[in-house]
Amino acid sequence: MAEELGLGFGEGVPVEVLPEGCRHRPEARAGLAARSKACLALTCCLLSFPILAGLSTLLMAGQLRVPGKDCMLRAITEERSEPSPQQVYSPPRGKPRAHLTIKKQTPAPHLKNQLSALHWEHDLGMAFTKNGMKYINKSLVIPESGDYFIYSQITFRGTTSVCGDISRGRRPNKPDSITVVITKVADSYPEPARLLTGSKSVCEISNNWFQSLYLGAMFSLEEGDRLMVNVSDISLVDYTKEDKTFFGAFLL
């Protein structure tokens, strides 16, 4: 029987041979069919296991990739939302500047053709010094080289008696004009340099009078230069209000 089922192939396929007496029984054929179905089912299970395992692996890999993608997208979004260093706003560097207001002056003998330096308030009321600018010994000290705008307004006040004495030729230590000079003192120059000068006749007004002189211009200054304001007569300077007499400078 086995040789007959070889059907010419190189080797015969093993086939279960029923005993001679049971070859034609229906029960035997049914058992053989059931056994064949069981083998087929087992084979299908064995073949499907790798497929199911592969699908499970792919599914798990897909589930693991999702959080990674979310993290990547979140990182990219956060990176885009954060401004780059070039886009971060940085406030401009503070430039040196100062505004000084007049304070009551100490009386001093007035000498002809001699200009006296004024004292200033530097940290009260409207007065201030910022970003390196300093006020030392009647002078503004320049902290860094550059182009500065320098300004000053000096208000003088007088009476008719003074003007009357001057007009009649009597000069009781009183000038016939008022003069303001902004002076620069530098270590590189042996003498103070006059930057701005303003003058006004005192007796052009017949009554009690107030007269203001304003000076302002741009100058190139060096670090360490000192600026001061000199006047022809300190006793005529109006120190009653800080908006009448002031002095300042700032870097452009």
Swiss-Prot record:
Residues 96-252 form the THD domain. Residues 1-39 are cytoplasmic. It is found in: Membrane. InterPro entries: TNF, TNF_dom, Tumour_necrosis_fac-like_dom. GO terms for biological process: immune response; positive regulation of canonical NF-kappaB signal transduction. The record marks S188, E191 as: Important for binding TNFRSF6B. Keywords: Cytokine, Disulfide bond, Glycoprotein, Membrane, Signal-anchor, Transmembrane, Transmembrane helix. The chain crosses the membrane at residues 40-60. Signal peptide: none annotated. It comes from the Eukaryota. Residues 61-252 are extracellular. GO terms for molecular function: cytokine activity; tumor necrosis factor receptor binding. Receptor for TNFRSF25 and TNFRSF6B. Mediates activation of NF-kappa-B. Inhibits vascular endothelial growth and angiogenesis (in vitro). Promotes activation of caspases and apoptosis. Promotes splenocyte alloactivation. Homotrimer. Belongs to the tumor necrosis factor family. This is Tumor necrosis factor ligand superfamily member 15. It comes from Mus musculus.
